[in-house]
């Protein structure tokens, strides 16, 4: 293992590393809450986001997960993952992540809400 990798691993376990890690996790979980709150405000059933930065929602209006991908990308310029990418059981669902900053997350939520209403 390279020296740089060893030092990076060591830094994670320092007080500063722990502080930064906790800050990042709290940011991502806060973003996930913003996403779930936004989806639920327009009666979209969603799952996840409480213990991870991934949020799944049921694709509305009988669309396939790929149709939802196309709609979000081309209409509101938001990218996510079609559920069918996880196998046939994922069809009918769509996955979003909370790996953006708070401002970009709120912007994406508003775009999604406007694109799905």
Where on the chain are the PLM-derived regions?
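PLP-dependent class I/II
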Residues: 1-117
């Amino acid at each position: 293992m390279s020296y740089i990798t060893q030092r990076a691993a060591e830094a994670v376990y320092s007080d500063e590393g722990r502080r930064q890690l906790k800050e990042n996790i709290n940011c991502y979980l806060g973003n996930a809450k913003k996403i779930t709150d936004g989806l639920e405000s327009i009666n979209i059933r969603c799952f996840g986001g409480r213990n991870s930065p991934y949020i799944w929602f049921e694709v509305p209006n009988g669309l396939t997960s790929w149709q939802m991908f196309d709609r979000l990308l081309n209409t509101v310029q938001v990218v996510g993952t079609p559920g069918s990418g996880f196998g046939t059981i994922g069809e009918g669902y769509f996955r979003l992540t909370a790996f953006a900053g708070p401002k970009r997350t709120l912007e994406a939520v508003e775009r999604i809400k406007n694109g799905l209403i």
